[in-house]
Amino acid sequence: MKAAVVNEFKKALEIKEVERPKLEEGEVLVKIEACGVCHTDLHAAHGDWPIKPKLPLIPGHEGVGIVVEVAKGVKSIKVGDRVGIPWLYSACGECEYCLTGQETLCPHQLNGGYSVDGGYAEYCKAPADYVAKIPDNLDPVEVAPILCAGVTTYKALKVSGARPGEWVAIYGIGGLGHIALQYAKAMGLNVVAVDISDEKSKLAKDLGADIAINGLKEDPVKAIHDQVGGVHAAISVAVNKKAFEQAYQSVKRGGTLVVVGLPNADLPIPIFDTVLNGVSVKGSIVGTRKDMQEALDFAARGKVRPIVETAELEEINEVFERMEKGKINGRIVLKLKED
């Protein structure tokens, strides 16, 4: 089968023929129709995170396709089902985190396109218990980003504790942020969208933001406090330190900052203000299988629709170059050619 392979960190991916995965008990083989491209894939290719991925590696954790083979012991999935293979490839199912509904914190988890091969290939295998069933009315290209960007931002909004009618600020209206905005509106929240371009501000308003702020033209912290008295929750999906600091300062007393983006920086938090104002700071990463079902349900009901651009598998290195330069609006999805 054809795949895009990382053979060496910080080098171009190689498009090559590799052996089709062989199934073990409990696994399914998926013929990939589409696979979203995430910044995590770029980090995997660069090997620049503290925990390195395996080498050689086939990246991709937003793979969507049709099940073409099932192994012994598979009961919940059948040949012909359309499924997604997400970041949470598998977990142990036995630790305190798995047993308390926090399987994304499992220390023994495997991650698609990182610790195991992922969806930048014509075929990918995965444990049947951890693939996501894709609703019949969803297009594989459009639904691919829900497997990471979608469930990640949906989960962040859940853990923020913000309730319908309350205010949430979303810092960064890019690949994650434009999806987070749609989930927030679908959940009944009032949204302040913050970015640093008029183009992103217009996009935010088009997607339903109640207030859109260009952080290069006005101080978003002052604007938020002046207009709504501070937000009940702030979600930072940006990749620069300043946005995280502003997000923290935007939160009202008793509010919550949820950290999602991963800039290479520390987050300075004033202890006195945090204690006095009862502010909570939480980290949130992807979502559980239950979160995934819920995130997909919003998409199936037409409440969330990622902005996508398609590319071919052979164009992955060009896509990564654009990603590094910040030249991508929405999400790029690799569309695999049919036989």
Curated annotation (Swiss-Prot):
Cite the binding residues for Zn(2+) 2: C92, C95, C98, C106
What residue ranges carry the coiled-coil annotation? none
Task: From the record, give the transmembrane residue ranges.
Answer: none
Pfam families noted in UniProt: ADH_N (PF08240), ADH_zinc_N (PF00107)
Top-level EC class: oxidoreductase
Which InterPro entries does UniProt cross-reference here? Answer: ADH-like_C (IPR013149), ADH-like_N (IPR013154), ADH_Zn_CS (IPR002328), GroES-like_sf (IPR011032), NAD(P)-bd_dom_sf (IPR036291), PKS_ER (IPR020843)
For this UniProt record, the keywords arranged alphabetically read as follows:
Metal-binding, NAD, Oxidoreductase, Zinc
Q: List the catalysed reactions.
A: a primary alcohol + NAD(+) = an aldehyde + NADH + H(+); a secondary alcohol + NAD(+) = a ketone + NADH + H(+)
User: Which amino acids does the record list as binding Zn(2+) 1?
Assistant: C38, H61, C148
Necessary cofactors: Zn(2+)
The entry summarizes how activity is regulated as: The rate-limiting step is NADH release. Catabolite repression.
Any one Gene Ontology MF annotation carried by this entry is: zinc ion binding
- Record text on cofactor binding: Binds 2 Zn(2+) ions per subunit.
* Claim: NAD is one of the keywords in the record: yes
Binding residues for NAD(+): G172, I173, G174, G175, L176, G177, D195, K200, V260, G261, L262, R331
Organism domain of life = Bacteria
List its EC numbers. 1.1.1.1
**Which family does the entry's similarity section mention?**
Belongs to the zinc-containing alcohol dehydrogenase family.
Q: What does this protein do?
A: Active with primary alcohols, including methanol.
Designated name of the protein: Alcohol dehydrogenase
Record the organism.
Geobacillus stearothermophilus
Gene name of this polypeptide: adh
